[in-house]
From Swiss-Prot:
This is UPF0246 protein CPR_2119. It holds the Pfam family H2O2_YaaD. It comes from Clostridium perfringens (strain SM101 / Type A). It comes from the Bacteria. GO terms for biological process: response to hydroperoxide. NCBIfam families: PRK02101.1-3 (NF002542). Signal peptide: none annotated.
Length: 254
């Protein structure tokens, strides 16, 4: 069983006091191809492409120019660097070494630049969303560039797991990069809803955080069987069998 998360736009590269070796992303060669294309762009090209302000464009341009493929094994792990809502829910800063090692086996972070990241892959500062409309070496976009590579890597990783199931906690933008995987293995998609009057509705900021909270639940409880996720009860959520349908599992909170 492997869970999926989307990356966050914000990175914190402050190094923690952590004695654990980080790894080089498996698709570093593909990332280098993408970055070599991005290095040819000027700030005035990046801003409309990535839909960012000029200030962010300057920062992004610098990150792109400074990016390289040199790894020393002491970089900050990506799982501790990302700072979006999902990662606030994951709250991996208090993970033990054993927690991080389990998480490294049971979580993959989808990425426009790196394809699929392990939590303990070493961080290099970057900004590139999967939906960015950029052509890389003749490809139509990043989905076209990645093709089936990300999906195939996940299927290979699943070979080492007893239960061949994907827990899809990624956004649609990122899941789209592996959308054919449900024809190969079972994909369970948890959905998190809040009570609004007489109905339950998805509240984006809470839903994003809950995705990370579920990964935390998986990690802290060493969960390897998908059925055990129905016991997820952090922060007031509970499995709602009535609203769930097939492999879309709904968790509600009053």
């Amino acid at each position: 069983m492997i869970a999926l998360l989307s990356p966050a736009k914000t990175l914190d590269l402050t190094k923690p006091n952590l004695d654990i070796e980080t790894s080089k992303p498996i698709f570093i060669s593909e990332a280098e191809v993408i970055m070599n294309n991005l290095k040819e762009l000027e700030i005035q090209d990046l801003c409309p492409l990535m839909k960012i302000s000029e200030d962010l464009g300057v920062q992004t341009f610098t990150k792109i120019q400074d990016w390289n493929t040199i790894y020393y094994g002491d970089e900050k792990p990506f799982v501790l660097s990302f700072k979006g809502e999902a990662y606030r829910g994951l709250d991996a800063d208090d993970f033990t070494k054993e927690d991080l090692e389990f998480c490294n086996d049971s979580l993959r972070i989808l990425s426009g630049l790196y394809g699929a990241l392990k939590p303990l892959d070493g961080t290099k500062a970057y900004r590139l969303e999967m939906g960015t409309k950029i052509s890389i070496d003749g490809s139509k976009n990043l989905y076209d560039f990645w093709g089936n590579k990300i999906m195939d890597s996940l299927l290979k990783d699943l070979e080492n797991h007893k239960e061949k199931v994907i827990i899809n906690l990624a956004s649609n933008e990122y899941y789209k990069s592996i959308k054919q995987i449900d024809k190969k293995v079972r994909v369970i998609t948890p959905v998190f809803k809040e009570r609004k009057g007489i109905e339950y509705k998805v509240v984006t900021v809470y839903a994003k955080k809950a995705r990370g909270q579920m990964v935390r639940y998986i990690t802290k409880n060493r969960i390897t069987k998908s059925e055990d996720l129905k016991n997820f009860d952090l922060y007031g959520y509970e499995f709602n069998e009535r609203l769930s349908e097939g492999d879309t599992w709904v968790f509600t909170r009053d």
